[in-house]
């Protein structure tokens, strides 16, 4: 069965987290669509699933591209600095409008 995925980039966040805001700003600059999942209201079961999916990490943001765990904000910016982020994002759905401030 072929399952269509609307967003293949998922960012687990907290609204007040400055690293989450920074990571989302970079993705916005790249004009790629992503699904943001706010973790503050997770049940205990959801928290456990999140931690397991994130390889034991309990911090946010946690970023996934095509079901691959990228890591947090620093890891995302490391990919950008190394010139590898654009390659990971090249087949991702684009946003319909340019990034704010562009």
From Swiss-Prot:
Its main location: cytoplasm. The keyword Membrane does not apply. Residues 1-96 form the Glutaredoxin domain. SUPFAM superfamilies: Thioredoxin-like. The keyword Cytoplasm applies. One of its GO terms (biological process) is cellular response to oxidative stress. Disulfide bonds join 17-20. Pfam families: Glutaredoxin. It comes from the Bacteria. GO terms for molecular function: glutathione disulfide oxidoreductase activity. It is found in: Cytoplasm. Gene3D superfamilies: Glutaredoxin. Has a glutathione-disulfide oxidoreductase activity in the presence of NADPH and glutathione reductase. Reduces low molecular weight disulfides and proteins. Monomer. Belongs to the glutaredoxin family. This is Glutaredoxin 1. It comes from Rickettsia conorii (strain ATCC VR-613 / Malish 7).
């Amino acid at each position: 069965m072929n399952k269509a995925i609307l967003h293949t980039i998922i960012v687990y966040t907290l609204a007040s987290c400055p690293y989450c805001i920074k990571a989302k700003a970079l993705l916005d600059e790249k004009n790629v669509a992503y699904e943001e999942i706010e973790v503050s209201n997770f049940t205990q079961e959801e928290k456990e699933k999140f931690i397991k999916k994130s390889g034991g990490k309990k911090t946010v943001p946690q970023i996934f591209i095509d079901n691959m765990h990228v890591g947090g904000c620093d890891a995302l910016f490391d990919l950008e600095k190394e010139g590898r982020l654009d390659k990971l994002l090249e087949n991702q759905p684009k946003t319909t409008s340019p990034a704010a401030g562009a």
